[in-house]
Amino acid sequence: MKKMRWTAMAMAAAMVLSSGAAIPAMAEEAVGGNEEVLTSEPHKIRTIITTDGEIDDQCSLVRYMLYANMFELEGLVSSSSKFHYTTKEGEVFKGKTENQKWIDAYAQVYENLCKHADGFPDPEYLTSINVEGNVTAPGEMGTDTPGSLLIKKCIMDEREDMLFLQVWGGANTIAAALRSIEEEYKGTDQWEEVYKKVCDKIVLWNDLDQDNTVNDYILPHWPDVKVIMSYDQFWAIGYPWSSTTPEVYHKYYDEEFMTKYIANDANSLSQIYYNNLTSMGGEGEHPIRFLSEGDTPNFFYILDNGLRSWENPSYGGWAGRFNKVNCADDAWNIGSEERDPMATSGQMLSGYWNEASDDGDRYKPIWRWADDFQNEFAARMKWCTEEYENANHEPVVQVEEGIDLTAKRGETVTLTAKTYDPDGDQVSVAFWQYGDADTYGGDVELTAGEGDQVSFTVPEDAKTGDTIHIIVEAQDDDEETPITRYQRVIVTVGAETEQ
């Protein structure tokens, strides 16, 4: 069931609902109702984007630029795929040059973006990390290139935090970096330490498996590297979105929405985005409808919007949700098609892979958030041209009791949300159980309390170690493009105390 948002002040405090429906809080005060001003700095994850320049990559790159303040980008690397490469007959593969067009468009709105949020990277810095990778053929990984060497340098530096490698095309430039590391260190007394360093540090998101390097090289040679295999779910925001997303959400992708909020001749990023929307139709006029952003889930996964999706692929968020493959500790997938065998940790993977579905729908883990991420896309697009006071900005939400809690069977858990909106908007709060992300297999009853508060009792049939995920949503009341922020509270069932 889709989460529901109801008018908070109309609800009775004693209302009880089960999993699947949202409990709205009884907020009675504007601007979140807090005397103190809450603040929230984004948790920025290090990342490198590799792209083959497909038109939907280009659309994703525009959206990425609007969120560039939320990440620590270390490289923008051109890479080939089985669809695009320099030696393909009839192909004009522009690579680094094409990426620079997007950086130049970003540069034109950079100063205005900085009026709305701190942390947007300088365009000159982006130009300095825009490099060519392995682009000559699908799966070519035998050559050291500026892109592969940049990736290798980031992997081998002294930092220990996660390095998230985004594969928008083929994984071959990343494979070339790993091949170079293996050639340099394997057979030396440093190899065991280097191998562990690499496997502990990097997480690789592989979109559509667009060359053979993950199957043929990365997993057999680096079986402990964490890999997220994304095959199907991203179609909820990809080319076939109209058939994978329920009709109720089509209004966030259709011509009216895109024309009103995205197409803006005064906005250089907007221009380059909607030019792609119309270019696919050939000659003549074409509707400005959403086209495809199949690679956007790459960075949605590490976007700090409060859903904590990067902590564990099974949690779910704007990027979708993933099941663990039993025979490979660190391979996560959402695909349902039969794949070639992959060697990992000495075992082979083949056949139908488990797909993470919400309510039995394999696309729902993304489309359930469509209104939220499309509204924020529209709001951030406005940041490119408007002054701060004429645009909408995200609210802040925190949970007073914390976001990682332990409770015993039969114990009552109370959650109190505190909110703030930088624009002075009213903020509505809703609570709901994300049952698909739980390891506890049942529903909990949520009871609305006073103010922005909800409570529930841990069921008696819950097992020690089971987790219950409660999503706390805070949405401002902007009339056109409301923005939503979240907190995910994970309640772990604790062991009973022996008498």
How does the language model describe each region?
Residues 1-10:
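Bacterial N-terminal signal peptides that target proteins for export
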Residues 11, 15-19:
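Hydrophobic core
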Residues 19-30:
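Sec-dependent signal peptide cleavage junction
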Residues 28-445, 453, 457, 461, ...:
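N-terminal acidic, glycine/proline-rich low-complexity segments
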Residues 475-482:
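Short, solvent-exposed loop/turn segments at the edges of extracellular beta-sandwich modules
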Residues 482-489:
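Extracellular and select intracellular beta-sandwich modules with Ser/Thr-enriched
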Residues 490-496:
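Short beta-strand edge segments in extracellular beta-sheet folds
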